[in-house]
């Protein structure tokens, strides 16, 4: 997940373009979404031929790098001759996806704002898009999230960026995960998805949740800005990625939020 932008290139009043399902199983896939890169690589090693510079998992991923999520190298992607390009409406920009389509490449655009949407889109990408069998890790992830115990509810500030300060707002995947873990973020009703916030005017909260991505908050960089609030440092990958890490996310995040 790169630095957040409060935009929805394929949402709102603009309808999603057709979501292609290939007539045959793709043999060459390029992923422009770190979460989905990991999902495809773990499920079908060798299927991916290209991924962004931000695609850090699996650690041993050996594919051609094609630039960033917000500035992919369209000629480099085209040169790889992929059967399918996987994208996301929040991670990637409309002009880049339009350029890929103009080059004749099929682009599958995902839309994930909640855990149920993540599970649905993962199956669509892997099974419908890539022609793969439903992976066991996806079943394990769904089971892990179904098995959550009820927790006392707490209110939290959840920054995602510093300089300027930005936080989780409405309609976010990370916010949905936290809510399922008993944490209600204080800007959930904000008009923006990633609003800028004034630390001098914070709503009442029980804690501050500080992920290590997209901004890398640490014990020495973040908690000091919220005196009097307990700080929970959490794995940004487990909070914001929708892929194999979802199977362990309830345990990892739950432990950090205690």
Language-model features: where?
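N-terminal ligand-binding lobe of clamshell/alpha-beta domains
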Residues: 2-258
């Amino acid at each position: 997940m790169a630095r957040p932008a409060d935009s929805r290139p394929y949402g709102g009043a603009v309808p999603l373009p057709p979501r292609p399902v290939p007539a045959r199983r793709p043999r060459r896939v390029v992923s422009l979404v770190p979460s989905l890169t990991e999902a495809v690589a773990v499920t079908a090693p060798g299927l991916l031929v290209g991924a962004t510079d931000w695609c850090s998992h699996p650690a041993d991923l050996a594919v051609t790098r094609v630039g960033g999520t917000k500035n992919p190298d369209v000629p480099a992607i085209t040169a790889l001759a992929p059967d399918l390009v996987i994208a996301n409406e929040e991670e990637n920009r409309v002009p880049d996806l339009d350029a890929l389509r103009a080059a004749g490449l099929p682009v599958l655009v995902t839309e994930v704002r909640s855990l149920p949407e993540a599970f649905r889109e993962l199956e669509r990408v892997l099974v419908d898009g890539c022609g793969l069998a439903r992976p066991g890790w996806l079943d394990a992830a769904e089971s892990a999230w179904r098995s959550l115990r009820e927790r006392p509810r707490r209110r939290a500030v959840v920054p995602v960026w510093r300089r300027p300060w930005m936080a989780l707002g409405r309609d976010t995947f990370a916010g949905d995960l936290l809510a399922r873990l008993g944490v209600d973020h204080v800007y959930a009703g904000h008009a923006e998805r990633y609003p800028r916030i004034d630390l001098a005017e914070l709503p009442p909260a029980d804690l501050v949740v500080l992920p290590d991505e997209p901004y890398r908050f640490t014990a020495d960089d973040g908690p000091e800005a919220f005196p009097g609030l307990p700080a929970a440092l959490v794995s940004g990958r487990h909070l914001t990625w929708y892929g194999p890490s979802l199977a362990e996310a309830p345990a990892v995040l739950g432990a950090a939020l205690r």
